């Protein structure tokens, strides 16, 4: 029912195509919000300081995720453009090359998340307990950053191809694994270690690693015209440059928003301390639900327009 062919995108009814493409994307964005709420629930079992630490970490991660956005947006837009131009073999090269470049760049950024958190935490003047947990969360999240970079670039390739159902499947699988692992790794249920807030970050890393592997498996197996060939997995620096050319301007806009969030959180932390940070984080997670439909339609429009 939600199948959309290349011919539908090029010549079909625009409202119908947008709706069919947007439904899985809205569903996956809702699932992502639900996952964040579940994270919040289990971290909340550790106390208000833990919620404040994750809230403090989230804005730092928002900046660290800017390179992920570069390759995800570039992968989606460039794939859509090449598919629309009928350059199917060239389109196949985009997601894999974007994912490979994302892994390289996010690995470097991930090292920064391990090295810099103590310095960054001091800028917000949190309590010692909040700062220590934020450092633990950010250090563990460095693994998630690499997995997310690969998963999002591949997933965005499916979206750019018009196969939003595959993108939903990849994202939903990552979220499901994350949700299952959250209580096990945060609170140490069954045979799992109790890692506290770091467990939430590790659960995210494992979830998105599963998502990346599933996306790769779907691409190897092939879905419609999107399948990996020997030519498509060959490193292609001109394609990577094109991905950067498309993704950098949008990522730059996002970086500006993340810096603004960083300043807001700094003020909240200095003025209201851990309780204020926790309240801000809870409120921002709940408020994110309002943006889900617009995000889904925006992603669908990007796939159509290219």
List the predicted regions and their residue ranges.
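Hydrophobic/aromatic residues within transmembrane alpha-helices of membrane transport systems
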Residues: 27, 42-43, 54, 79-84, ...
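Alpha-helical transmembrane segments of multi-pass membrane transporters
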Residues: 113, 169-195, 210-218
